[in-house]
Design a protein with these regions (language model features):
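Bacterial Sec signal peptide processing site at the extreme N-terminus
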Residues: 21-45
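Bacterial N-terminal signal peptides that target proteins for export
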Residues: 1-11
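Acidic-aromatic/histidine active-site loop/patch
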Residues: 307
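Extracytoplasmic and endomembrane cell-envelope/extracellular-matrix remodeling and assembly machinery
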Residues: 312-319
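Bacterial N-terminal signal peptides
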Residues: 10-22
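Short coil/linker segments at helix-helix boundaries
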Residues: 36-67, 71-72, 85-202, 210-247, ...
């Protein structure tokens, strides 16, 4: 029995529709598969031992991931990778270039790297806000009182996005200290960090570096100014030491996140004019191999790089 004319017409049309739908979704399907691979591959960068290789490779990696995100803009894995990636790129590399220019007193380069750092951390913040939703996007730059309610209502599933938003906003402020309106957002950064630490008291994140980062951020906030202008060396030291404790283990009781010790030695040494503390802490960093924490080898290479730089300028810093 031959199929009816209507059935013979419907079947090819249905097949054509399926093919077209498949073609429309093929890009997203490919990206979603790739995103899973990228998440699994992320530790390879964190374990990199060659600073310059990572410095040169990360921008291209981020732009590739951003291209995938453009195809699938709702992909949470890609947004998470971009959030962390831009914050880490800004901290490890762009700020390092900025700091090199500062010590060399190259004013044009200082200005250029300063502006670039602002742009990079703004990208990190924007991706974090995509994860955190409309209320955060609406109220982050509103009054601290209104925003505090939004932060308080944000649950533990958004803990990491909150952390990156605080680190990004704090870094943006740090690179725009001459803009009074930016300084007004310091209470907002503290609100976010307080909420993250409140969540951490109930349940620490599985990654020790994630547990330590809010304390590093607070250490930097408390050491950002002298005691005369609101800085608190005692509180900053406590926060840095907490970060080190959270990354310690029986084999390495002094902590494995060397960047926390580098920042503590440099910032508190200058803040309190304690040259011995400055020297001893940075010397301890250099006496600890970066491989002490293989999973965070790159961060420890950054710590060594900065410790060497600070010690090379010790005499002029304590004139």
């Amino acid at each position: 029995m031959r199929p009816s004319l209507s059935l013979r017409l419907v079947l090819p049309l249905a097949l054509l529709l399926v093919v077209n739908l498949g073609a429309c979704d093929l890009g997203q399907l490919t990206v979603r598969t790739t995103a899973k691979v990228l998440v699994r591959a992320q530790p390879s960068l964190q374990q990199e031992s060659d600073y310059q290789l990572a410095h040169d490779a990360l921008p291209g990696t981020l732009k590739t991931i951003e291209g995938f995100w453009f195809v699938d803009p709702e992909n949470e894995s890609l947004i998470s990778l971009l959030t962390e990636g831009y914050c880490q790129y800004g901290t490890a590399f762009v700020e390092d270039d900025w700091e090199v220019a500062k010590f060399a007193k190259k004013l044009d380069e200082i200005e250029a790297h300063n502006a670039r750092a602002t742009h990079i951390f703004t990208r990190c913040l924007n991706y974090a806000l995509k994860q955190l939703g409309d209320d955060w996007q609406r109220d982050l730059f509103g009054t601290p009182e209104a925003f505090a309610k939004v932060a308080k209502a944000t649950g533990g599933d958004q803990r990491d996005a909150m952390m990156w938003s605080a680190l990004a906003l704090g870094s943006i402020i740090n690179h725009n200290l001459s803009r009074v309106e930016m300084l007004s957002y310091l209470p907002t950064v503290k609100i976010i960090l307080d909420r993250v630490l409140e969540l951490d008291k109930a349940r620490l994140p599985g990654r020790p570096d994630y547990a330590a980062l809010p304390h590093v951020a607070y250490g930097m906030l408390y050491s950002a100014a002298s005691a005369q202008f609101g800085g608190r060396a005692d509180r900053a030291k406590l926060e840095f030491e907490t970060a080190l404790k959270l990354t310690s283990n029986p084999e390495h009781p002094d902590g494995r996140l060397l960047l926390a010790r580098t920042l503590m030695g440099y910032r508190l040494g200058l803040m309190t004019n304690d040259r011995k503390f400055f020297h001893d802490q940075l010397k301890q960093v250099l006496e600890t191999p970066p491989s002490v924490w293989p999973e965070q080898r790159l961060a420890n290479e950054v710590a060594h790089r900065r410790a060497r730089r600070y010690l090379s300028h010790e005499k002029e810093l304590f004139q």
